[in-house]
């Protein structure tokens, strides 16, 4: 999920976020980030389904 980020890099990023946003703001920030990622995945899935449907329609048109 995080590409080639290792544990030490993730800990460093979390530490920097803790310094910048403070401990009180991190749960809210994490919740917002999780929601944004979820919405992006949902949107991505919809786009893939639309493309697949359009592709099937185009293939059916060509085969007729």
Curated annotation (Swiss-Prot):
GO terms for biological process: protein transport by the Tat complex. Signal peptide: none annotated. InterPro entries: TatA/B/E, TatA/E. It is a single-pass membrane protein. It is found in: Cell membrane. The chain crosses the membrane at residues 10-30. The keyword Aminoacyl-tRNA synthetase does not apply. It comes from the Bacteria. GO terms for cellular component: TAT protein transport complex. The keyword DNA-binding does not apply. GO terms for molecular function: protein transmembrane transporter activity. Keywords: Cell membrane, Membrane, Protein transport, Translocation, Transmembrane, Transmembrane helix, Transport. Forms a complex with TatC. PANTHER family: SEC-INDEPENDENT PROTEIN TRANSLOCASE PROTEIN TATA. Part of the twin-arginine translocation (Tat) system that transports large folded proteins containing a characteristic twin-arginine motif in their signal peptide across membranes. TatA could form the protein-conducting channel of the Tat system. Belongs to the TatA/E family. NCBIfam families: PRK14861.1, tatAE. This is Sec-independent protein translocase protein TatA. It comes from Alkaliphilus oremlandii (strain OhILAs).
């Amino acid at each position: 999920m995080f590409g080639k980020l290792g544990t030490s890099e993730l800990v460093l990023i979390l530490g920097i976020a803790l310094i910048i946003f403070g401990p009180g703001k991190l749960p809210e920030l994490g919740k917002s980030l999780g929601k944004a990622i979820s919405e992006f995945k949902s949107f991505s899935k919809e786009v893939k389904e639309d493309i697949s449907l359009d592709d099937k329609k185009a293939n059916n048109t060509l085969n007729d």
